[in-house]
Amino acid sequence: MLNIGIFFGSKSVEHEISIITAQQVLSSIDRKKYNVIPIYISKSGEWFTGKVLEDLETFKDFDKLEKKAKKIDSFSVKNNKLLLKYGLKKQTIDFCFLVFHGTNGEDGTFQGMCEIFGIPYSGCNHFSSAFTMDKVVTKLLLKEKEISVVDFEYTTEINEEFFKRCEKNLGYPMIVKPARLGSSIGVSKVVDRKNFEEAVKNVLLFDNKVLVEKWINAREINCAVMGYKNIFVSELEEINKKNDFFNFEEKYFKKGKKFSNHIIPARIDENLKNKIKEIAKDTFKILECSGNVRIDFLIADKIYVNEINTIPGALSFYIWQKSGFTFSQIIDNMINMGLERFKDKKIVSIDTNILKIKVGK
């Protein structure tokens, strides 16, 4: 039986969202197939494990969490396995199932560690995770491949020239957002210069790279894509938004309306549905994704790819359920795809005695 480590939390403004997704995974994973080990990374970077981490109430008081959970003192790697040490005990991890959202987890950092240590893991590889985390890099690449994206500007240097360039090239209203965050955190719609400057200040609380997009009156359609060698595309989800865009409050703080904003299948004709699915598959391939990804679209005069989520909230299970997959099947597929990718890795070292060769001056 495989020892599956469920990794979540980490130093991210989406920390709490990661905890929620992890609880859903922990309650849905098939424990007849896997030995499940929850591993929580705190906002300060400390690692914890223990059964207590499977209770959402544990995370409401960090002082109690520290006392109840087992703090991991150190870890090492042997034979493509992660060895965790806490007190006098050790725990072997055969596979890292990643449920991070945002920076220091979803962005290729943890994936890179797994690559260096030679440990199999779920989701996109370190390369794909890193550049899809940056909305600007993603848009530039998709645009190069003739995938439609909304007109945009970006900067890491806030000055008058940037404000004027956006006003000239995009015009009001505009959408201002952090380039490397998800969950709609820090996103604002601006209608004048005062709004614009305030929105940029807000973004700078979260990220030093600002993305500004032309606002368009569009329908929001989402699509989940899962695969490694064989690619599956889900039913389409329509967001029934109350505001001009689906913001953080609507996503997570509408009591009693957990998924009432999600209309599945989307209310669109078959021809448009097929076009969106084809673009979703193309985007997945262009960005070299693997695992389970959600691609968000804006539908107006064109089909625009808006954002890519390489570890989507709740693993997009609510979309996949409408496509015939249970939550546990989604988890199984992600584990199997991660293991298959690990087996397919190319040889990265060769035997050589080059260091024994004498090199003349």
Curated annotation (Swiss-Prot):
Cofactor(s) the protein requires to work: Mg(2+); Mn(2+)
Cofactor, free-text remark: Binds 2 magnesium or manganese ions per subunit.
BP-aspect Gene Ontology terms: cell wall organization; peptidoglycan biosynthetic process; regulation of cell shape
Catalytic activity: 2 D-alanine + ATP = D-alanyl-D-alanine + ADP + phosphate + H(+)
EC number: 6.3.2.4
GO MF annotations, alphabetized: ATP binding; D-alanine-D-alanine ligase activity; metal ion binding
GO cellular component: cytosol
Keyword Ribosomal protein: no
Binding residues annotated for ATP, in chain numbering: 167-222
Cystines in this chain: none
Binding site for Mg(2+) 2: 307, 309
Residues that coordinate or bind Mg(2+) 1: 296, 307
Keywords: ATP-binding, Cell shape, Cell wall biogenesis/degradation, Cytoplasm, Ligase, Magnesium, Manganese, Metal-binding, Nucleotide-binding, Peptidoglycan synthesis
Record function comment: Cell wall formation.
Protein name (record): D-alanine--D-alanine ligase
Organism per entry: Thermosipho melanesiensis (strain DSM 12029 / CIP 104789 / BI429)
Lineage of source species: Bacteria, Thermotogati, Thermotogota, Thermotogae, Thermotogales
